């Protein structure tokens, strides 16, 4: 996401201890991974965040930093909100150029330029290759309508794009279809590369979350060799693909009911050479016929995936159990009473990338995330929600399988922040039949 002046509202960074900063910087510069548009930032816990180029960063780079470049270092991908531009970047402002070129063009059409029109120019946008996706809160004044469609050619030229689209509100339907209109160009298909994985999709039909990059990197490092995974909310393959390509899951059952996302998912599986290890289940996952197949289940739906919990319990292997990766938006307002899972007010929301969180076993978190070299940022609200979810899942497992199961919280991972006091987290929950754990 780019903001006014071309400054992203968040960038990906690699966090380590100060004594390893120079070694990290030299490695990142050598491999053309260092983001020179933003400053290195010292975090509150004393660690240092080095901004990196999101599309170029691979999981193998993180392994090299940990194991070869700086053995013993803590290497954690995270996001920096409102990063500080470097001195070089501060002299370059796409927003200023946009204002200058649009105002000149508007006045050349005989329309008076005003402070109202200037305030109505876009303050943020997403760049998808040659397509620029504008935010919904721009170009709302009536005067713009009389200047279309030539206006969009001027905007695209000023911002270095060939196609333009404008975001609306996400449809409240269950498929979360984005209300995006194409302003300039013949189609909305774009391609992104994250951690070496190619994602193609139509921005007018499918959503793409830039903020999930740290979770995609974490998923890519999970030990899934030989495992079967069920992804209950696959979308265009946000997590299905990292599980297949990097975590080396043996097979993935991908569930999705948005037909446009299914088209993109099928294409992305082919693009990345893993179509033979994935079966797409198109439709409502509550009608899924699978059971007793999964070593892991990914529940990547926010604000809550609770409707999918009974299905997740059913598809876990009856005799061996497995791991659930449960996404949730959790409110952390001071003094607010947390609603337990199963209540009518379960819909929660949330924000920012801290680092690590709790884990009590090895499974479900990388070795670096188990170290205490970075400050533990677990909020009490996250812990309370996780404990309530653990209890609820244990009850569901008993109901589904007719026998007692033991559940244990392995890890709580922050993904991103939406607003103050609203946190998107992932709970890694181990679920085993009691006869396996004594």
Swiss-Prot record:
The UniProt record lists the EC number as 2.5.1.114
State any GO BP term from the record.
tRNA methylation
Look up the record and name the pathway of this protein. Answer: tRNA modification; wybutosine-tRNA(Phe) biosynthesis
Kindly state which reaction or reactions the protein catalyses.
4-demethylwyosine(37) in tRNA(Phe) + S-adenosyl-L-methionine = 4-demethyl-7-[(3S)-3-amino-3-carboxypropyl]wyosine(37) in tRNA(Phe) + S-methyl-5'-thioadenosine + H(+)
Q: Name one GO molecular function term.
A: tRNA methyltransferase activity
Q: Which family does it belong to?
A: Belongs to the class I-like SAM-binding methyltransferase superfamily. TRM5/TYW2 family.
Descriptive protein name: tRNA wybutosine-synthesizing protein 2 homolog
């Amino acid at each position: 996401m780019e903001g006014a002046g071309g400054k992203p509202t968040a960038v990906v960074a690699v966090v380590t201890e100060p004594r390893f900063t120079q070694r990290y910087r030299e490695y990142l510069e050598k491999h053309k991974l260092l983001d020179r548009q933003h400053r290195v930032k010292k975090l509150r816990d004393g660690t240092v965040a080095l901004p990196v180029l999101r599309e170029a960063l691979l999981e193998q780079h993180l392994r090299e930093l940990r194991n070869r470049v700086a053995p013993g270092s803590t290497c954690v991908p995270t996001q920096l909100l409102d990063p500080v531009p470097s001195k070089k970047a501060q002299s370059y402002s796409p927003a200023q150029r946009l204002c200058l070129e649009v105002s000149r063009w508007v006045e050349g059409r005989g329309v008076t330029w005003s402070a109202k029109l200037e305030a109505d120019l876009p303050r943020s946008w997403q760049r998808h290759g040659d397509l620029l996706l504008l935010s919904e809160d721009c170009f709302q004044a009536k005067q713009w309508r009389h200047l279309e469609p030539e206006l969009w050619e001027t905007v695209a030229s000023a911002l270095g794009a060939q196609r333009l689209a404008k975001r609306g509100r996400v449809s409240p339907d269950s498929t979360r279809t984005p209300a995006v209109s194409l302003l300039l160009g013949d189609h909305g298909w774009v391609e992104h590369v994250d951690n070496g994985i190619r994602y193609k999709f139509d921005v007018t039909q499918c959503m793409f979350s830039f903020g999930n990059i740290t979770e995609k990197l974490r998923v890519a490092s999970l030990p899934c060799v030989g495992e079967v995974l069920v992804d209950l909310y696959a979308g265009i393959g946000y997590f299905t693909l990292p599980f297949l390509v990097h975590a080396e899951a043996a097979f993935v059952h991908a569930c999705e009911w948005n037909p446009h996302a299914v088209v993109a998912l099928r294409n992305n599986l082919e693009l990345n050479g893993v179509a033979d290890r994935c079966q797409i289940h198109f439709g409502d996952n509550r009608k899924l016929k699978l059971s007793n197949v999964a070593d892991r289940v990914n529940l990547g739906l926010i604000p809550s995936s609770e409707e999918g919990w009974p299905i997740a319990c059913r598809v876990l292997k009856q005799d061996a159990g497995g791991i659930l990766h449960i996404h949730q938006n959790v409110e952390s307002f001071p003094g607010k009473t947390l609603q337990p899972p199963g209540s009518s007010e379960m819909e929660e929301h949330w924000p920012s990338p801290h680092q690590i969180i709790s884990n009590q076993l090895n499974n479900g978190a990388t070795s670096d995330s188990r170290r205490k070299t970075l400050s533990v940022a677990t909020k009490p609200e996250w812990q309370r929600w996780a404990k309530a979810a653990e209890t609820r899942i244990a009850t569901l497992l008993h109901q589904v399988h007719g026998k007692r199961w033991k559940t244990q919280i392995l890890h709580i991972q922050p993904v991103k922040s939406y607003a103050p006091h609203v946190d998107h987290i992932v709970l890694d929950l181990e679920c085993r039949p009691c006869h396996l754990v004594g």
